A protein has these predicted regions:
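Bacterial Sec-dependent N-terminal signal peptides
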Residues: 1-25
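Short, small/polar-rich motifs associated with maturation and membrane association
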Residues: 20-167
């Protein structure tokens, strides 16, 4: 009987070792995005930046862009600035593919053909990559841009035609 009990405990313990990790972080915060942007800005090569952008876009597909606003609770003896730093506001970085007169948002949750568009993006097609933060991002992209905006610019007409054909 002791052997059976010992075997059952050993079996249940082994099962917990191989169980998948439960993801408890269900929101993407401003702090996480600020850390990603600071790491992104340290990259030197355009090909590395494009690969990192693609990885981030696919990783963020599990998060949906929320339409509600951030709720900030101010406690006793706390300034508004301190409360805003503590608040966990949910937001996503906006990724944009920009041409001279038109720009496309790269969010797979809103636009299902984003995966196809991203397959066409290479370092030869992209002329420059710009990161917008703070007031500039909010002014251009509204509340969606408060966590930052990454814009990939291209002046290639051939690439623009390929994108139009996909969309």
């Amino acid at each position: 009987m002791k052997r059976l009990l010992f075997f059952a405990l050993l079996l249940s313990f082994c099962n917990t070792l191989f169980a998948q990790e439960i993801k408890t972080d269900s929101i993407l915060t401003e702090k996480q995005n600020a850390e990603w942007i600071s790491e992104f800005e340290k990259l030197d090569y355009k090909s590395e930046k494009i690969a990192e952008i693609k990885k981030k876009i696919f990783a963020d597909t599990i998060y949906k862009r929320q339409k509600n606003y951030c709720r900030i609770v101010i406690k006793n003896q706390e300034t508004i600035q301190e409360a805003m730093e503590i608040a966990n506001c949910e937001c996503k970085i906006v990724f944009v593919l920009g041409f001279k007169k038109i720009a496309y948002s790269l969010d797979p949750n809103e636009y299902p053909k984003t995966h196809t568009v991203l397959e066409l993006v290479t370092d030869e097609n992209i002329d420059k990559i710009t990161v917008l933060k703070g007031d500039i991002a909010s002014a251009l992209y509204g509340t969606n841009g408060r966590c930052g905006v990454v814009v990939m610019y291209s002046e290639s007409r051939k690439f623009k035609r390929k994108i139009k054909n996909v969309l």
